[in-house]
């Protein structure tokens, strides 16, 4: 049983990241954003593809041996910061902001859906877990990456509630958005995550289900902390 890892899985917008960061700060663990690793990997490959003379689309190129061989040239480092976003470095360059662009968000699915790239990221995560106590959020942390984690939680909420949260978040950032369109995107993302062939989203048999529809953020945090204290 792995006592260095607390796994938080669930669909997009269920509150995993916010909850994970605050719990990590309270119990002295480090919060690890697995999505940042996939984004950094996507950024590296996207740049490599853009600088190559090939005419293949990015989606097709990442399936080639040229793209897969480039994994040996990639070094992704994570700098932890209590209660804040991880700082991510790609081959020595800080890319914490560069990995959050709409372009990378759009292309990341081509990386996350391929086993060789998931294995690369998972290996990085396991290396970190040997050195640090981590609370990790994602889609398959408790089912595939760390199935031996001592504590596993699955956070969920209705698509309507998750869309409202995202809408308010965008408003705070001064970005105009449509609630209905956001909900449609969330529903499509759920379908894609749950039906993908590799590492689909589902609740682990031994994960504790928490419905964040009916609980405030502080209530969710309190509930998880009580379970961790048992």
Curated annotation (Swiss-Prot):
Residues bound to ATP: 10-18
InterPro entries from the UniProt entry: Cytidylate_kin, Cytidylate_kinase_dom, P-loop_NTPase
GO biological process: nucleobase-containing small molecule interconversion; pyrimidine nucleotide metabolic process
Pfam families membership: Cytidylate_kin
Subcellular localization, as worded in the UniProt entry: Cytoplasm
PANTHER family: CYTIDYLATE KINASE (PTHR21299:SF2), CYTIDYLATE KINASE/PANTOATE-BETA-ALANINE LIGASE (PTHR21299)
Keywords attached to this entry: ATP-binding, Cytoplasm, Kinase, Nucleotide-binding, Transferase
NCBIfam families: cmk
Organism: Leptospira borgpetersenii serovar Hardjo-bovis (strain JB197)
Gene Ontology cellular component list: cytosol
Chief site of localization: cytoplasm
Family that this chain belongs to: Belongs to the cytidylate kinase family. Type 1 subfamily.
Gene (name only): cmk
Molecular function in Gene Ontology: ATP binding; CMP kinase activity; dCMP kinase activity
EC number(s) recorded for this UniProt protein: 2.7.4.25
Protein name listed in UniProt: Cytidylate kinase
Top-level class of the enzyme under EC nomenclature: transferase
Swiss-Prot/TrEMBL catalytic activity: CMP + ATP = CDP + ADP; dCMP + ATP = dCDP + ADP
């Amino acid at each position: 049983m792995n006592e260095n890892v607390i796994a938080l899985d669930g669909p997009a917008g269920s509150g995993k990241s916010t909850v994970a960061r605050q719990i990590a700060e309270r119990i002295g663990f480090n919060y690890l954003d697995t999505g940042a690793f996939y984004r950094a990997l996507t950024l590296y490959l996207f740049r490599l593809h853009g600088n190559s003379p090939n005419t293949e689309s990015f989606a097709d190129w990442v399936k080639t041996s040229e793209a897969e061989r480039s994994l040996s040239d990639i070094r992704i480092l994570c700098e932890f910061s209590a209660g804040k976003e991880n700082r991510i470095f790609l081959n020595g360059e800080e890319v914490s902001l560069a990995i959050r662009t709409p372009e990378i968000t759009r292309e990341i699915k081509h990386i996350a859906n391929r086993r060789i790239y998931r294995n690369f990221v998972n290996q990085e995560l396991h290396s970190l877990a040997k050195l640090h106590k981590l609370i990790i959020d994602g889609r398959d942390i408790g089912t595939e990456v760390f199935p031996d984690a001592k504590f596993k939680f699955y956070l969920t909420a209705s698509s309507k509630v998750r869309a409202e949260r995202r809408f308010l978040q965008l408003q705070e950032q001064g970005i105009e958005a449509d609630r209905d369109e956001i909900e449609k995107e969330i529903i499509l993302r759920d379908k894609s995550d749950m039906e993908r062939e590799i590492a689909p989203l589902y609740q682990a048999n031994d994960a504790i289900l928490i419905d964040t529809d009916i609980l405030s953020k502080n209530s969710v945090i309190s509930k998880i902390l009580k379970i961790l204290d048992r």
